[in-house]
Amino acid sequence: MIGILGAGAFGTALAVTLGREQPVTLWARGGTPRLAVDLPEQVQLTADFGEALAGTVLLAVPMQALGGLLRAEAARLQGRALVACCKGVDLATGLGPTGLIAEACPGSPAAILTGPSFAADIARGLPTALTLATQDEAAGEALQRQLSTAALRLYRTTDTVGAELGGALKNVIAIAAGVVIGAGLGQSARAALMTRGYAEMQRLALALGARPETLAGLSGLGDLVLTCTSDQSRNFRYGQALGAGAAFDGSVTVEGRATARAVVDLAVRHGIDMPIAAMVDALVEGRVTLPQAIQSLLSRPLKQE
């Protein structure tokens, strides 16, 4: 059996696709999933945390809530295969999801499920390919078999650093891409932004030990393309609202907002130039206006690509 902690859009979508083929217990804190879909018969919905603690547990909670959950429930989670289903960098520690798992539950295989996907597509059974990253190769093979379905295809890697950073950094670039479209700057500007943003992703990830092929795969480039080109992306929609000077629903989780600050801190610590990420952070925090952010990026010194 599989347990899923968190009944937000992604956790519910995973419950639906996995529950078509095997028993799943979905923990919803309030007892109601966020995604309005019919759950398969093999999916048990519960508000009891303990009922969702299977041998394999998917952690489908917001990135900034993951560390607190792991620390609070470490004793009950210890020894189970733990798969993070969120993207970002923890503001308190600077760790990614698998780092938080390893710190709180050192006896558990730590993995992350990431890549280009929208919850609605997964729930509808549309073909989707994701990356499953874990440094435990035996656990990775077992999880790959257990979590793959007829419509959900998983590719395995041991490069947790690359997989985590690809998923985290693309959210920051997606906000910037949304700003470009929201401000009416055009498709050419978005293409340039995505390309230069990808270069920033590579610089930081490689400096932190990621493999280049991971950044060029599903969890990096694949996720970047999807998130920067669709208004199904919450990060992209948030950026659009920023660019247009419009209000945005404050109840919607936008992982890239917090990630931008953490990414800038990492970049400074490692001496990596990330002007787009820095401008996103400054814009989100209100330290610069949109015209100032645009002017700052366009007035940078000319250089070789």
UniProtKB/Swiss-Prot annotation:
Pathway in which the depicted protein is active: Membrane lipid metabolism; glycerophospholipid metabolism
Active-site residues, as the UniProt record annotates them: 170
InterPro entries attached to this UniProt entry: 6-PGluconate_DH-like_C_sf, 6PGD_dom2, G3P_DH_NAD-dep, G3P_DH_NAD-dep_C, G3P_DH_NAD-dep_N, NAD(P)-bd_dom_sf
UniProt name for this protein: Glycerol-3-phosphate dehydrogenase [NAD(P)+]
UniProt source species: Cereibacter sphaeroides (strain ATCC 17023 / DSM 158 / JCM 6121 / CCUG 31486 / LMG 2827 / NBRC 12203 / NCIMB 8253 / ATH 2.4.1.) (Rhodobacter sphaeroides)
Disulfide-bonded cysteines: none
Enzyme class: oxidoreductase
Record bears the keyword Acyltransferase: no
Family under the similarity heading: Belongs to the NAD-dependent glycerol-3-phosphate dehydrogenase family.
Binding site for sn-glycerol 3-phosphate: 87, 115, 117, 170, 223, 233-235
